[in-house]
């Protein structure tokens, strides 16, 4: 199941109302109940009536309990075992746009390790929901203490934040062994303005302009596709695995909400052995 472009805003608007109701509840017990209700609302908004099974022990979410920078919170997702996974949903429950990203893995992709940086607006649970090839859903959660990341300024001013927009780098882990997953780190220069940041010079809110999709392929075969939203950090850094059977080219294509596209190809060496 994928989230179409037009579906993201209704989810955010609906859940923005739900968030207000949740934060109105006083006391720790009521707060826990409100968080549980919030997650149930999110499940229904994103997945409808589909059943989500407990993925604890299979899905691991590594994130700081208390983040040093709420605008750059590192999240490391790891999948154990051999369940065939075709997609991962990353949900930041109390963000204005809770569905931070939907990763879809292609034939050359390896879903077992995924790292990225996100914005966190308030103390929240982060949920990772894995979808297997037989359309089963499994989830795990991690509570993160951070606040203000969605409205944190991007650089000293808008002009600085826009410098070198669209520049892409990829670092490949060595050595490369045939038939084994290869780790790649993808760095994209993009401010990811979400409409909540204030320009520190003009004191006006910067209009939204953020990455909507990222496509990665190897020799023309899909590695992964990402549908993103306002919770992805500025200048995203995403690490992922892929399985190249031979030397070739890794291609990255990025599209933002202004329909600007940025692309670049990178050589992958022949495997050792």
Protein language model regions, located:
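N-terminal export leaders
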Residues: 1-10, 14
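Low-complexity, Pro/Ser/Thr- and charge-rich linker/hinge segments at domain boundaries
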Residues: 29-31, 147-169, 271-273
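N-terminal edge beta-strand
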Residues: 43-70, 160-178
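Short edge beta-strand/loop segments characteristic of extracellular beta-sandwich folds
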Residues: 62, 74-80, 183-191, 199-202
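Aromatic sugar-binding surface patches on proteins
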Residues: 107-115, 230-239
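Short acidic/polar inter-strand loop motif in beta-rich domains
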Residues: 133-139, 256-264
């Amino acid at each position: 199941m994928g989230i179409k472009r037009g579906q993201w805003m209704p989810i955010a608007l609906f859940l923005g109302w739900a968030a207000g109701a949740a934060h109105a509840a006083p006391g720790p017990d009521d707060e826990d109940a409100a968080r549980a209700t919030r997650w149930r609302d999110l499940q229904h908004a994103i997945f409808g009536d589909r059943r989500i099974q407990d993925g604890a022990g299979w899905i691991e979410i590594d994130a700081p309990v208390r983040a040093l920078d709420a605008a750059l919170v590192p999240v490391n997702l790891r999948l154990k075992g051999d369940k065939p996974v075709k997609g991962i949903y990353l949900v930041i429950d109390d963000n204005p746009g809770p569905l931070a990203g939907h990763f879809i893995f292609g034939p050359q992709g390896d879903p077992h390790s995924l790292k990225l940086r996100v914005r966190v607006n308030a103390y929240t649970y982060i949920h990772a929901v894995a979808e297997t090839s037989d359309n089963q859903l499994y989830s795990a959660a991690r509570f993160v203490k951070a606040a203000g990341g969605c409205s944190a300024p991007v650089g000293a001013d808008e002009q600085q934040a826009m410098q070198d927009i669209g520049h892409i780098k990829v670092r490949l882990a060595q050595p490369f062994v045939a038939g084994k997953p290869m780790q790649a780190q993808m760095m994209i220069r993009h401010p990811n303005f979400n409409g909540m940041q204030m320009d520190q010079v003009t004191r006006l809110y910067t209009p939204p302009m953020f990455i909507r999709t990222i496509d990665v392929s190897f020799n023309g075969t899909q590695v992964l596709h990402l549908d993103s939203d306002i919770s992805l950090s500025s200048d995203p850094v995403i690490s992922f695995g892929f399985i190249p059977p031979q030397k070739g080219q890794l291609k990255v294509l990025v599209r933002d909400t202004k329909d600007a596209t940025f692309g670049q190809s990178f050589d992958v060496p022949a495997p050792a052995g």
